[in-house]
Amino acid sequence: MNLDAPYCELSPEVVLDALEAAGHRCDGRVLALNSYENRVYQIGTEEGEPVVAKFYRPGRWSDAAIREEHAFSAELASQEIPVVTPLLQAGESLHAHNGFRYAVFPRRGGRWPELGTTLEREWVGRFLGRIHAVGRAQRFRDRGTLSVAGLGREARDSVLDGNWMPDYLATKYADLTEVLLDEVEAQADSWGGARLGRILGDCHRGNILWTDKGPHFVDLDDCLTGPAIQDLWMLLAGSQQEMRSQLVDLLKGYEQFLTFDRGELALIEPLRALRMIHYSAWLARRWDDPAFPRAFPWFAEPRYWEEHYRALEEQLAAVTGPRLEL
């Protein structure tokens, strides 16, 4: 398999054959869903309800790490927390076909939430408190831990090694990110005082779907060990005052099930900085996958890097500036 273009052999026929091998009688309907890191399809079945198949990116996760993701989701579901868990075939959630590893999920629809009301924010907060309470019961063994080295320094090096930006900007980017990551690392010393646990890892509004019954959480692909604030800060938006108000609502629900350490609020801007650096590195690392140049053509343009540099300058000011306090 070509890991630079890992999905070139994943044809609709292979997808359907894989689903049949996992015990599903398909009716021939295959709809590609919006996903870049993995490939995700909605597949019609003769049983009635469509299912969703996720084909994991080759080379990214070990089998043990994927099974640990599945076990975490099953553990949450056993506590009646609304997460979408993979279907089992002969007791197994992870399958393989033609060199691809995949899992099959029930289709669970919904809309992306606005989180524009106190009720919605408290509702999500309650579930996050319950998720983290379960997450602290044990540790991951085969999945990563959130770190400045992984999300920051290794990501920065990937960008610089790829010669993505003009020479005049590359030196400035290297200097700026060195200062920024030094500052993030200094502030991240407080992570040692944070109680780490199993968390969702990529908890933004796009990974929450809402129905008349409330929210449910999808895609635990990035679950890892980390501080609780990582699953909260991406749900905040707007000015400091607006984010403070939103966080008050989230924590009102959260703390019905688990006490939140206010000291973790100092990690919000450092975590945002890491996400900004890591996002560009993610695109750089995936550029040989043909889906990425098609979806993100602006990434290879100097203008993107100029804007990214300015955003990192502003983020350095945010990291060293006043912290969000309740």
Predicted features, each with a name:
Residues 45-141:
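ATP-binding pocket architecture of kinase catalytic cores
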Residues 1-88, 212-214, 324-326:
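Conserved NTP-binding catalytic cores of kinases and kinase-like/nucleotidyltransferase enzymes
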Residues 34-53, 86, 184-232, 326:
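Active-site acidic catalytic loop and adjacent metal/ATP-binding pocket
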Residues 114-172, 194-196, 295-298:
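A cross-family kinase active-site recognition segment
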Residues 3, 163-164, 281-326:
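ATP/Mg2+ or Mg2+-diphosphate-binding catalytic cores
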Residues 262-272:
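All-alpha amphipathic helical-bundle segments outside canonical DNA-binding/catalytic cores
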Residues 228-259, 275-291:
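Active-site activation/catalytic loop segments of kinase-like enzymes and analogous catalytic loops
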Residues 58, 102-115, 158-165, 279-298:
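A glycine-centered beta->alpha junction motif in the catalytic cores
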